[in-house]
Amino acid sequence: GVWSKFTTEVGSDRRGMTGVDEKTLKEIGNKLTSIPQDFNSHNTIKRIFENKKNMFSTGQNIDWATAESLAFATLLNEGYPVRLVGQDSVRGTFSQRHAGITDQLTGDKYFPLRNISENQAQLEIIDSLLSEMGVLGFEYGYSLSEPDSLVLWEAQFGDFANGAQVIFDQFISSGEKNMVTCKWFGSTFATWV
């Protein structure tokens, strides 16, 4: 099935090549921090993007949100789809991500991560409803059918994961173990943030 390419022989090296050269990182960084000239972004957003541009040009003081965007962008650039879902995933709960920005005059949205290259993989960043169990259950199921995708579910705050506890306990934690006896369970590369 779709997971067979991820199996390795017992004792074989499971490490993959994960490095990205500096030139590519800087090119991607430039695209992540570029806003179209005719786009009327908020002054605060302009300042944030200028700070990020400086991080990429100097290689200094790269913060978590910038490193996260760079990680997503390199995966997209290599052909791996990225799907991030949570209550405030586009902006980021602490206003750190700004994966999508809004034109202050037209209301149009711009997603720098969707503009890395012409041949990049699909990016989905979705602000979900406040129904942790339903959303996490869906994302878990989605991750089972899309093994080449990075699927992430983000709890807006850590304790919000409590509302999805049944999914963690009955599906995710026991999924691989029960894979042998139950046909609907299986491996997942999904990430719970």
Residue ranges of predicted features:
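Flexible, glycine-rich loop/tail regions that form catalytic "lids" or insertion modules at the edges
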Residues: 1-193
